[in-house]
Regions:
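Conserved beta-strand termini and adjacent loop/short-helix elements that scaffold enzyme active sites
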Residues: 41, 89, 181, 282, ...
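Conserved S-adenosyl-L-methionine
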Residues: 453-462
């Protein structure tokens, strides 16, 4: 957390800072500098000694970073050759030397999941940045004197800022401007020629600010690749994305739903590990769908597997805590968080695992059930771009909060920058479901190599909130239906103009959200829903269960 203001109120800062101590329970530090206050909660993952504690300092400048920098050893080697010395094994210690050498150009050099704030002592200014996907959280707002404040979560800022917004992924903040340094959806081989895509772009940012950036026109070249070449590259790049995320000084585990995405991550990791990996799954006591398939995968890959069961009572009693934790009112995000939160809570309480690999971001790249209804490859690509841009408000937010509130770290192999860039560059005509099976390219990429049972590799997609047990979503709906009368629903929902609640369930979530984040609804652009402009997708529930092509997904 960073309060960028001379004479900032230290007590007000500490009050907000303490809201997220669970993100880093190992050690906390607050320092006051000439131009503000910087605070850091540490969860030790790389470099477990006290020397890895932040903020890191260099010639009066400071940096705090929540992140993992992959391949940092090579960057560190180059910096040592330039004369820099290091006191810890932390990957984040390289950031200030990188900034000194390359300025804000450093952010485009990073293969990382990160959110950071740098204080430049020479210029007496603050620079903030966030990874291109938004896997690591970062929020900002302004106090009563228009001073900017940065923090990992919105709850840090509620007592300081009147309006809070998510920091845009792939941007850095400098001198009052948000500048795009990398947009993962700008792939000229899909959207047009390199000449069309190169050059400056400008969009309206949050708070009405102008966000500018450039694109170098690099062509990925995937338009001319045949299907087998594409699938080989998908295979190789995902394997690399998993492998680099296995590096940790803390114990690593895996969330396993038994669906395609998490199962692939686990299967790849099992092949790359010299001992059985540790996998974890959760489901309702009454009708868990995932547990059966997760056990099948665990047996196949030989993992050390743990099953957790949850009850209706646990779900309902956790609802308010989950919404406060998430900082959202979005229906599908909250539903899917119930099981994930309870699973991660059990992992924290019952094991020594501190890093979890998950299967998020595959859907945004390869398609949901509803994208089977895309009217054209171009529409599919446009929808994928939208989902990638908004990931930080939905699935990625869910994974981060459910995991970090339990003092664990999330790593997302499908969010590997090289992998995302490559898949976004594949001709969308090859990605749309013309094969009779969604996500065909991903499935076909791993048909050889004995990664998974064929039944799992070809299993129909089921949303996590459905697959932990249909009864969980039904229980939440039933609870909300009994919470309000029809008249109360009509009256209470009428007061909202942004993202207006349209069911009693959505109203219940919004009312709880407002209790902890009053007036901050615009942090979330809208409810996550299928594209209602497409035939077959004009539905009023985000669950794939309401789609006509759901088929065997829930079996």
């Amino acid at each position: 957390m960073c309060y960028c203001k001379v004479g900032a109120d230290i007590e007000k800062f500490k009050k907000g800072f303490q809201e997220t101590v669970s993100r880093g329970p190992d050690q906390s530090r607050v320092i006051t500098i000439t131009d503000g206050i910087i605070g850091f909660h540490r969860l030790a993952i790389m470099g477990l000694t006290p020397s890895g504690m932040q903020p890191f300092a260099l010639n009066g400048s400071y940096v705090v970073c929540n992140g993992e920098i992959y391949g940092f050893a090579e960057l560190k080697k180059d910096l040592k050759a330039k004369g820099y010395t290091f006191e810890s094994d932390s990957d984040c210690e390289i950031l200030l030397p990188l900034y000194r050498e390359y300025g804000t150009d450093m952010f485009a050099m990073l293969d990382a999941e990160f959110a950071c704030v740098i204080y430049d002592a020479e210029k007496r200014s603050f620079i903030a940045a966030r990874d291109p996907i938004g896997i690591r959280p970062l929020y900002y707002g302004y106090d009563e004197d228009d001073a900017i404040v940065f923090a990992s979560e919105a709850k840090n800022l509620v007592s300081i800022c009147d309006r809070i917004m998510p920091f845009p992924p792939g941007h850095y903040y400098k001198d009052g401007q948000f500048v795009c340094y990398r947009d993962m959806t700008k792939v000229p081989s899909v959207v047009g020629s390199a000449d069309d895509a190169a050059g400056a772009s400008e969009v309206t940012g949050t708070f009405g600010s102008k966000v500018t950036g450039t694109f170098d026109g690099k062509v990925t070249g995937t338009r001319d690749e045949d299907l087998e070449t594409i699938c080989k590259n998908i295979h190789d790049k995902l394997v690399a994305g998993v492998e680099k995320r296995l590096v940790s000084d803390a114990k690593v585990g895996f969330l396993l739903s038994g669906g395609l995405d998490s199962s692939l991550v686990c299967a790849i990791a099992a092949k790359k590990s010299d001992k059985p990996i540790r996998t974890f799954a959760i489901g309702m006591e009454t009708d868990a769908i995932d547990l059966k398939y997760a056990k099948q995968v665990a047996d196949y890959i030989g993992s050390e597997h743990t099953e957790i069961y949850m009850t209706k009572e646990q779900v309902l009693s956790s609802l308010e805590d989950v919404i406060k934790m998430l900082g959202t009112f979005d229906i599908t995000t909250i539903r899917a968080s119930m099981g994930m939160y309870l699973l991660c809570k059990a992992i924290h309480e019952q094991t020594d695992v501190r890093v979890l690999l998950t299967g998020e971001i595959s859907d945004e790249l390869f398609g949901y059930k509803y994208t089977d209804f895309a009217p054209s490859p171009e529409a599919f690509q446009k929808e994928s771009e939208k989902r990638i841009h908004e990931l930080h408000m939905y699935d990625v937010l869910r994974a981060d909060r459910c995991i970090s509130v339990n003092s664990l770290e999330a790593r997302v192999p499908f969010g590997d920058l090289d992998f995302v860039e490559y898949v976004m560059g594949i001709d969308p005509a090859k990605k749309v479901n013309v094969y009779g099976k969604g996500k065909y390219l991903l499935r076909h990429a791993f048909e050889e190599g004995d990664y998974l049972p064929y039944e799992i590799l070809m299993r129909e997609k089921a949303a996590f909130s459905d697959a932990v047990g249909h009864s969980m979503v039904d229980d939440l709906k039933e609870y909300a239906e009994g919470y309000y009368t029809d008249e109360e629903f009509k009256e209470l929902s009428a007061k909202y103009t942004h993202a207006k609640p349209f069911t009693k369930e959505s109203l219940l979530y919004r009312e709880i959200f407002e209790k902890f984040y009053p007036g901050q609804g615009e942090m979330i652009v809208d409810f996550w829903m299928p594209n209602k402009e497409w035939e077959g997708c004009d539905v009023n529930d985000p669950s794939a269960r309401v789609l006509s092509n759901y088929g065997d997904s829930g079996k």
